[in-house]
């Protein structure tokens, strides 16, 4: 996408001049003030002046894009901490930039890093021998709704190259469930190289791990403290009393609460508004820095180009921001693979490779919980078979084949697939996925998509988030925590938790939080090792998957009977989840 910033800005300035002339002709006057946007509390303003790559262990040795380590550092081994058990805020920022950049972009030379893209590649696409550091100032703030549980983090980055004569702002909501630096390698890098201010935000997600055992939290700067010691800088703590927490720990020790899951905010409904708030704060920051007594608000939506752009959930946040932008802040949207929660499958069509596809128009929770039931079985089908040894063939790589076959057996016993053996049952499972919306091009992708945890993680996280359930609810007998090599919940290693702001991605991907099925036969286990009570075998916790599906559909996943007050899950739980899903659908009015 090519954006002509000059032509758009000229039109905006002309309209501003016309509006001013009309007001003057009518005898009106304007006395603009630079007001802090509602709900926003500034936390810090820090200069990151580095232009030469180094260790990046202090603010003075860091820049906005690479944390001071440059193109070479982003492509190298993880930067070390002086004290791994007690990383500093500066070290955590550096490593968060490192992990978030690499978490979205291919950092391998053969993948194009350093030649097609990367800090050393200019905005015009020229490959340089430099390290690509971008010095400037970063303004961190928190957006809250008064509850103390929303706590959306915003980081406005203003490069020293910001052009006051041609102002532009790029809004970068984090992809996935990532923290505030989640879009640094996508929208962030593009905007900084263009000399734009960049407004990064976690959009209400982020790495917020609350340790139920010791009442510790992440602070806004990524360091850890007790809830009390963190005070107003607390990023997230579960809304639970000490007495309730003690009782919970006695039954379910070594568990973690996750911000996106347990904030009881349904943050997805606010992704668009949070992205808009980041944009408004960016305008405030620019005016606060460059405004004068004679002209306190030199930058306005009328003379500043504002682009919202990101990928995945960040792309959805960008679309949501454009839908909710009644004030004309945003000029353009760049959304890569956005999670598009459609309200209907009617009135439009979708083609793939020139051919019409079926099964579209469903929500993320619908697709995810359906796939979570059938994918491990379908991965064994002949049409999905692979012989390669790679991450792509993860079920075979890590020895999950027997458990996947057990999933096929369990589905057959419950009448959810047909066939006399694994070959027939897995083919039926694959056919069901195709009929539900997955194309044959996805046949071999079910293997890694499921076995790496996408289905179990999203099916555990999103329904709980939509339903606004507290951590102690253990919906569908599911919780979250660190686990050992056999999948049993254990205490998080102190250094792991201390570094988690920089290593975790806001989900239950095992770094360090994992999806735990509490009623696995023999004791609570991570989803990979779970033994379902109804089958008595290790089948990736089929019972939990069926329960999570029922939360989304409102009916028993085996019998099709409507949920009741005594069923698992209950009707009330499903009603809450479906109400939350209704809050996140888009309307397409940009």
Predicted regions and their residues:
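C-terminal His-loop and adjacent cap/lid subdomain of alpha/beta-hydrolase
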Residues: 32-590
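Sec-dependent signal peptide recognition
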Residues: 9-16
